[in-house]
């Protein structure tokens, strides 16, 4: 459990635990001194004089250890909080960096809400455990053990009476571990589902308005939120009731100790000083013990969160440490790939020559975009090999490999930042002149400078404040700025209006000069001049050749061409 909570770094918390244990022990000593003061006053109640020096000695001990406790608690708190927040912050950075190195296939298999829940809520649980729950739990247990030994040495009967509820409480909570874990996992699953639905509701708000489906979707969202609420209430009731029962059983020791002590004292079997020690010190151990029991439940939840974080950190990153060669020839040999059970690429072999334009065409679902993602190592093939410059992608250093690529997708993602910084994302070391020039080559400069803040204009998250054509041009500008030798274009103009399409086609022409280019084409006319056109059908290579050759073959490519030519005649009629 402790290993999960500390994310495998148990040694980091030792100092914090030791300081908290010392503070708890130090906090007990003034009450032992108080018991001795009361004993002295009680034993000398009929005497003519009392040894005040002895009383001052006990008062001095109380004052000194109250001060020591204060210093230890402050030192422990300072160290614990620094450690907890540092563990959480460093852990989030480590996990974010680790996610960057994971295959896209692994990440796409998880929802963004699930990963975000781990980065935020799971780390918050771990943070709370390290800063509060774990030190209090361990110091409470240590105090209980030390006091138990002391009590049993001083008086076995009183010791048993005081601590009789402790093993029962611990046994109860131990037996209910799986129940607590099951409840916590269920509530976490409901919360992730709720977060997913809220994100989907916000992302789809325009579509929902267009179809007047807001009420129906809101009703579904309300159901999910209500289910999450009910699961949390049920969890709190179940775990809370369990903790309350355990605390009640633990505190049975207090009245039982008083009852047994009174009986033994009346019968002369217990000295007054021993009875007073149990009354003063015995009552003090119940607070840290009860706090330990309460924290135990929280630690169980934090342990589950820590386990989720560790499991994500254990996810195997993309392998490879070999340098990539200067050659940019792409060789695909007997490659097959499946999304779960569905085979998308089936035994494809293909050579893509350096400094040539190769186009992938075919019906929707034929594997065009998937092949692009395999080349850029967003996914790894299930079978076969892909090489660039003779180096197998699986053995190439992932960061150095990605330096070879500039990728322009149909769906462009822009960051919530200025236009300038979004373009600079292509090359963080680029000068202002280089960024301006990239914008001009991408056909983006004119529309940028017309905006009130020009290049300093803030973009909404995902580029929400820009048109599709504007987003695409900024995407091409940062690809130009990166100046990678291999360009991958995934239907970059398929959803644009004619004016934007023409501008972006000119921008792409600037981007791909003297590069190795692979393009997924929706409109066949845009790739008529390609050096090589690869026709894909159901994940297999159907035809390969230039436009004129493929038309003469009268195969699938010609069928696609005829369909597109015929579609020009289509009109909306009523």
Describe each region flagged by the PLM.
Residues 14-72, 153-157, 269-272:
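Transmembrane helix-loop-helix hairpins at lipid-water interfaces of multipass membrane proteins
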Residues 5-11, 104-105, 121-130, 134, ...:
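An intracellular "coupling" helix at the cytosolic face of ABC transporter transmembrane type-1 domains
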Residues 326-574:
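ABC-type nucleotide-binding domain
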Residues 58-73, 166-170, 239-253, 272-294:
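Hydrophobic alpha-helical segments in the permease module
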């Amino acid at each position: 459990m402790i290993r999960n909570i500390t994310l495998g770094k148990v040694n980091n918390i030792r100092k914090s635990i030791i300081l908290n244990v010392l503070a708890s022990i130090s906090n007990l000593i003034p009450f032992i001194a108080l018991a001795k003061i009361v004993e002295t006053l009680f034993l000398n109640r009929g005497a003519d004089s009392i040894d005040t020096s002895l009383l001052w000695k006990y008062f001095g001990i109380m004052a000194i250890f109250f001060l020591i406790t204060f210093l230890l608690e402050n030192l422990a708190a300072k160290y614990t909080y620094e450690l907890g927040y540092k563990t959480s912050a460093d852990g989030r950075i480590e996990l974010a960096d680790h996610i960057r190195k994971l295959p896209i296939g692994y990440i796409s298999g998880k929802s963004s809400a699930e990963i975000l829940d781990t980065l935020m809520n799971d780390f918050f649980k771990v943070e709370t455990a390290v800063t509060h729950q774990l030190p209090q739990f361990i110091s409470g247990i240590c105090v209980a053990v030390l006091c138990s030994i002391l009590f049993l040495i001083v008086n076995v009967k009183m010791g048993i009476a005081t601590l009789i509820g402790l093993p029962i409480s611990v046994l109860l909570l131990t037996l209910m571990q799986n129940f607590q874990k099951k409840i916590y996992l269920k509530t976490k699953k409901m919360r992730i589902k709720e977060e997913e639905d809220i994100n989907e509701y916000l992302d789809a708000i325009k579509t929902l308005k267009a179809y007047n489906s807001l009420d129906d979707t809101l009703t579904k969202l309300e159901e999910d939120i209500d289910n999450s609420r009910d699961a949390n209430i049920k969890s709190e009731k179940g775990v809370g009731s369990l903790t309350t029962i355990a605390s009640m059983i633990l505190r049975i020791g207090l009245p039982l100790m008083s009852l047994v002590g009174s009986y033994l004292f009346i019968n002369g079997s217990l000295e007054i000083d021993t009875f007073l020690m149990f009354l003063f010190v015995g009552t003090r151990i119940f607070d840290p013990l009860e706090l330990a029991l309460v924290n135990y439940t929280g630690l169980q939840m934090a342990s589950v969160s820590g386990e989720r974080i560790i499991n994500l950190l254990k996810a195997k990153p993309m392998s490879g440490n070999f340098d990539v060669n200067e050659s940019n020839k792409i060789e695909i040999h007997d490659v097959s790939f499946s999304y779960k059970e569905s085979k998308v690429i089936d035994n494809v072999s293909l050579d893509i020559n350096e400094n040539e334009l190769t186009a992938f065409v075919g019906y929707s679902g034929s594997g065009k975009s998937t092949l692009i993602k395999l080349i850029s190592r967003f996914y790894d093939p299930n079978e076969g090999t892909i090489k660039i410059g003779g180096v197998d992608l699986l053995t190439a250093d992932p960061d150095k490999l990605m330096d070879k690529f500039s990728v322009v997708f149909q769906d462009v993602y822009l960051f919530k930042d200025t236009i300038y910084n979004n373009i600079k994302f292509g090359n963080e070391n680029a000068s202002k002149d280089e960024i301006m020039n990239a914008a001009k080559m991408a056909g983006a400069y004119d529309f940028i400078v017309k905006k009130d803040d020009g290049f300093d204009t803030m973009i909404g998250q995902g580029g929400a404040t820009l048109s599709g054509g504007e987003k695409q041009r900024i995407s091409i500008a940062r690809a130009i700025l990166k100046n990678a030798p291999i360009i991958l274009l995934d239907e970059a103009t398929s959803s644009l209006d004619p004016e934007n399409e023409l501008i972006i086609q000119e921008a792409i022409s600037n981007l791909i000069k003297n590069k190795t280019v692979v393009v997924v084409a929706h409109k066949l006319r845009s790739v008529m001049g390609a050096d090589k056109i690869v026709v894909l059908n159901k994940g297999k290579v159907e035809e390969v050749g230039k436009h004129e050759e493929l038309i003469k073959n009268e195969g699938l490519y010609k069928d696609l061409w005829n369909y597109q030519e015929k579609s020009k005649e289509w009109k909306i009629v009523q």
